[in-house]
Amino acid sequence: GVDEILDAFVAFRDAMHAGGATARTHPFVVKMAKIESAEQATREVAMQLATGVSGVMFVEVESAEEVRWALDAMRWTSDGGTRPESSVGTAPEYWGVSEAEYRERADLWPLDPGGELVSWVIVESREGLANVREIAAVPGIGVLWPGAGTLRRVFSTVSDDGTRVLDEEAWEGAIQQVLAACKEFDVACGYPANASDIEVRMEQGFSVFVMGWGDAGFATVELGRELAGR
């Protein structure tokens, strides 16, 4: 849970900050455990936002209700959410702003066009796919993602000799199902791309990407910029 890892994360953030990093130059997007209740979302999201993160990634999302719990937890109670007004923490320090300015900026984009918090919602199960249109329709999602790696396991079977066999057609169908929901409800769609597939994924309509580490990751970034004319 968040309690077990928060101290380690804060120590890492402090080291980054001591080296000159801020939310403007080095924004953090952190991964949440699966949301099981509104109460969990309110408590654990507030704890992470209070450290100065700029985004929260919600994994294994399977219903619109979970999304609403998650997004409400990213908004102050005074803005209609469930984030306690007291949960400012040390966020203003990492953002490099006053507490008053942090409170103004720390709202959820795109519900607040000037908000500087963003949510990532990941669909990576059959149940999530069955509900993906309802999920995508919830206002306030920053980026909706198919959990491509997890979905590979979902659409794989194990042969008699123990070899894992992927149903490529079903897996790709799941990826496209999430993309279609994004397009229908005008939500940015993300994908974990590499140099071999970023061009086709951009052509399909994916607009947000995560890449791997090292030279291969940087090569993918450069290729993506070139393809986008940047």
Specify the residue positions occupied by each region the protein language model found.
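Active-site-proximal loop/turn and secondary-structure-junction residues that shape catalytic pockets
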Residues: 1, 34-36, 60-62, 123-127, ...
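Glycine-rich, proline-tolerant flexible connector loops at the mouths of alpha/beta enzymes
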Residues: 1-12, 146-169
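Active-site beta->alpha loop and helix N-cap motifs at the rims of alpha/beta catalytic domains
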Residues: 2-68, 73-76
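Hydrophobic faces of well-ordered beta-strands that scaffold small-molecule active sites
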Residues: 26-33, 56-58, 119-123, 144-146, ...
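Conserved anion-binding
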Residues: 43, 51-139, 148-153
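Short, electropositive alpha-helical surface patch
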Residues: 55, 196-216
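C-terminal helical cap(s) of enzyme catalytic domains, especially alpha/beta-barrels
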Residues: 64-80, 160-161, 214-230
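Anion (oxyanion) recognition and catalysis
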Residues: 179, 183, 202
